[in-house]
Amino acid sequence: QFIRDLSFENAAVQNGVVAQGQPEIQVQVALDARKRTVENQYDVIMKLKIESKTKEDAPKSIFLIELEYGGVFLIENIAEQQLHPFLMIECPRMLFPFVRRIISDVSRDGGYPPLNLDQIDFVSLYRQQIAARAAQQPQGSA
């Protein structure tokens, strides 16, 4: 497992924003999996973009965390048709506790209460990605 990229921008301090009350937290998640040159090894990368904003008519950014966290997985004895779902559901599920801790630590070290991410439903995320990919493919002519 490894941190590929980590960024924390404390916009509130930089721009003099004073946060009143509970902020709005937006979380975006993207997943990627690639075969490595070593047989049966795969890189799985989880990309998170987390933005905290004030709850106003014109919201202002409080902080932004961007994290790319990866794992190298040796996968054997899995049927070919089950490999992609395994890489995009089970592998991220194994990485998530570490991602959650990093996000919590970074937000706390940035001077804010620790941000404890809710569990991510990787099955739903996978289904959404499959549906989006199917919608982008051109339809055959009748």
For the regions a language model picked out, list residue spans one by one.
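N-terminal intrinsically disordered, cationic/polar leader segments
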Residues: 1-94, 98-142
